Amino acid sequence: MSHPSKLDRAAIVAAGMELLARDGLRGLSLRAIAAALEVAPNALYHHVKDRKDLERMLAAEVSVLIHAALRRKINSTTRSPEDAVRAMAAEYMTFAREHRLLYEALLVPRPAGGADAIAPEQLWLFALDLVTQVSGKVAAHEATVAIWAFLHGMASLQSVNAFDDEKPFSSFDFGLQAWMWAANAARLAEEDAARGRVKVAGKRAAVRHNR
């Protein structure tokens, strides 16, 4: 890597992402990044507090990458809400498989708020919007967390080669379909409740009119 003309957070993130893609979180250190940037380790502390701060910066950058990958996949064709969620789920798994070491950084602990929380929040809102179109608004947050947990679990199993003939990867389709049934059921229940409220409101209006 060439020596940066200006040492800033962007240069540190770029070097950190290269290191992360090659060695993963275990190989990540401020000293290694300083060596890649050809600067003294102390120079980094003007821009990065410590290793945890560095991990949060890189997790935010990984969020940007996976968000872009998901959005490209969704925008590639016109899809129904269910197809869009299926495409998102498949692309999430693809990213986790093809960029395993980057994916490891996606869920590092991070405090709420701050500049490094913006990208993960945007990724969350993107997924929430897709899920809401399937699950309805009432159960949207629960449904989004549920599919996130499912995908992360499957990605984690995939990363350790846990799937075989007895534990087939086709269980991904089984689990995703189960989520679809639950999400659709939540939306239908919400729609039924809304129709019930409209019907009750209509009856009350008729009673008032007849008085």
Give the ranges of each region predicted by the language model.
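Helix-turn-helix
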Residues: 11, 15, 19-53, 57
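Short hydrophobic clusters on alpha-helical segments that form packing/core surfaces
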Residues: 12-20, 28, 62, 66, ...
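Alpha-helical DNA-contacting segments of helix-turn-helix folds
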Residues: 20, 55-62, 69, 106, ...
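Hydrophobic alpha-helical connector segments
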Residues: 71-101, 120-124, 147
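Amphipathic alpha-helical packing segments from all-alpha helical-bundle domains
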Residues: 83, 107, 111-137, 141-146, ...
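Amphipathic alpha-helical segments used for helix-helix packing
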Residues: 93-114, 156-164
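C-terminal peripheral helix-coil segments that are non-catalytic and often amphipathic
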Residues: 129-137, 160-211
